[in-house]
Curated annotation (Swiss-Prot):
Function: Catalyzes the conversion of dihydroorotate to orotate with quinone as electron acceptor.
Identification of the protein by name: Dihydroorotate dehydrogenase (quinone)
Signal peptide as annotated in the record: none
PROSITE patterns: DHODEHASE_1 (PS00911)
Major location category of this protein: membrane
GO MF annotations, alphabetized: dihydroorotate dehydrogenase (quinone) activity
Length: 335
């Protein structure tokens, strides 16, 4: 079945196909039908009860338009966003490119979204009964020195409506954003956001976990430094990781020269290395959500065995369809 749908989608450019899929899932979410069952493979992470350990990675549903549709594919959790304080168009099109031979995708979207207020309204309307994470970022026009302002605005607005909040400082498509992963800049950001989280938990009488999303391009030394900051500021979880700037796995393939972050199957080895190194540094202090390159039960299990407690998928679903989600959710064994 999906082979026919894929043929139709792949006759379009990547972004048009994505937008078409979002609208189709938005419609499916409104219909009184179950597309696919929710596989039960429960796990508790960050004090939250997940029906299964397979989540939708941020970037798929930036505005939270199709939460119920994605929920009907069997995801145990859904992360929407990345969202910014105000709407922005992102980078010029075309900005999404398939690398067919490698089952990869390059994007340089640049946090295109309708703004945090629109996303919050969509989340409030959703009937999906799994865990919902909201991924927050900064507007492109905001100087990097003022990035904290944008993260605080978003955190305050989404806190009441999210089960957990992810702070995205690792997209390669927003100028200078990745500099927030290092040293004093990271410490200042985490210190301030942790303080804000504590204030909001008192205001709403409910503690919502705060998660950091990092890049797979960090060196071992940089990973150790990030891990130290995560522990010191009592951050609740970490997503490892985002897209990569490396082109080593796709050298010579069509579209490999395009600028942006590479995701999909070619990212698998790099993301597993990130998880493994991070797990050694954290030594169980906080959970890791594995993301990047998961394309089979074996590749997903490899990330669990490397130290991840949950997994997120997006690019591989474009190539393989929702059956992948069902297989992962049923067969992944969390340690």
């Amino acid at each position: 079945m999906y082979s026919l749908i894929r043929k139709c989608l792949f006759s379009m450019d990547a972004e048009t196909a994505h937008n078409f899929s979002i609208q189709a899932l938005k419609l499916a979410g409104k219909l009184p039908i179950n597309v696919l069952p929710m596989p039960l493979n429960p796990v508790e992470v960050m004090g939250l009860q997940f029906k299964n350990p397979i989540g939708l990675a941020a970037g798929a549903d930036k505005n939270g338009e199709a939460i119920d549709g994605f929920g009907k594919l069997g995801f145990g959790f859904i992360e929407v966003g990345t969202v910014t304080p105000v709407a922005q168009d992102g980078n010029p099109k075309p900005r999404q490119f398939r690398i067919l031979e490698a089952e990869g995708i390059i994007n340089r979207n640049g946090f295109n979204n309708l703004g945090v207020d629109v996303l919050v309204e969509n989340v409030k309307k959703a009937k999906y009964d799994g865990i919902i994470g909201i991924n927050i970022g900064k507007n492109a026009v905001t100087p990097i020195e003022r990035a904290l302002d944008d993260y605080q605005i978003c955190l305050r607005k989404v806190y009441e409506h999210a089960d957990y909040i992810t702070v995205n400082i690792s997209s390669p498509n927003t100028k200078n954003l990745r500099t927030l992963q290092y040293g004093e800049a990271l410490d200042d950001l985490l210190r301030s956001l942790k303080s804000e989280q504590e204030s909001l938990s008192q205001k709403f009488n409910r503690y919502k976990p705060l998660v950091l999303k990092i890049a797979p391009d960090l060196t071992d030394e940089e990973i150790a430094s990030v891990a130290d900051s995560l522990v010191r500021y009592k951050i609740d979880g970490v997503i490892a990781g985002n897209t990569t700037l490396s082109r080593d796995p796709v050298v010579g393939l069509k579209n490999a020269e395009q600028q942006g972050g590479l995701s999909g199957k070619p990212l698998n080895t790099l993301s597993t290395r990130l998880i493994s190194t991070l797990a050694k540094e954290l030594n169980g202090a906080l959970p890791i959500i594995g993301s990047g390159g998961i394309h089979s039960v074996a590749s997903g299990q490899e990330k669990i065995d490397a130290g991840a407690s949950l997994l997120q998928v997006y690019s591989a679903m474009i190539y393989q369809g929702p059956a992948l989600i069902q297989n992962l959710a049923k067969h992944i064994q969390v340690r």
